[in-house]
């Protein structure tokens, strides 16, 4: 089977991604102001219930590319117990999963396969890029490695590290849950706006900037 790789253009109107209209807004709830009190409250309650179910039942697709996958699987052990976040149900088929974790080095031969698997996932679906290699190619700045999986699929959460610890993966799940809780997706094909609205989430680097600048006493790794 021949595979073709399509480069993603976030600003492209006719690009293959997203298949639905997506728009980054400061607060999706601001659109509820122009609605009536009753319908606005009812639709808001329905969105809260649907998003609560989605963010607490994230089913990841079980596949890995490199050493970061080992750290991802470690989070499923009893020591870390990722079942607390509702993400312990590994799926062997992309059609039954709603989360793709690209863990490890993405080679150019594997990129079309990942893109095809992403296309086979049903909406709503999310992507976590785990590790420096998946984020930006890592130390492999060569012709055979894709310099970031966001070159061909959209990414929701980036996990830095080489490799990241299981705790970093669980923190990424919590960040993804916060983002899913603020999303506004169509409740039905006949109910409300058919667009997909995602909140503009603040990066962890910006959120912790003030805390890091205020540090005056640098501790050794043994004291942390």
Swiss-Prot record:
Source lineage: Bacteria, Pseudomonadati, Pseudomonadota, Gammaproteobacteria, Enterobacterales
Pfam family membership, one: Oxidored_q6
GO cellular component terms listed in the entry, alphabetical order: plasma membrane; respiratory chain complex I
Keyword Thylakoid: no
Cofactor(s) recorded in Swiss-Prot or TrEMBL: [4Fe-4S] cluster
Gene name, Swiss-Prot/TrEMBL: nuoB
Primary location group: membrane
InterPro entries per the UniProt record, alphabetical: NADH_UbQ_OxRdtase-like_20kDa (IPR006137), NADH_UQ_OxRdtase_20Kd_su (IPR006138)
Reactions performed catalytically: a quinone + NADH + 5 H(+)(in) = a quinol + NAD(+) + 4 H(+)(out)
Protein name in UniProt: NADH-quinone oxidoreductase subunit B
Organism: Enterobacter sp. (strain 638)
Localization per Swiss-Prot or TrEMBL: Cell inner membrane
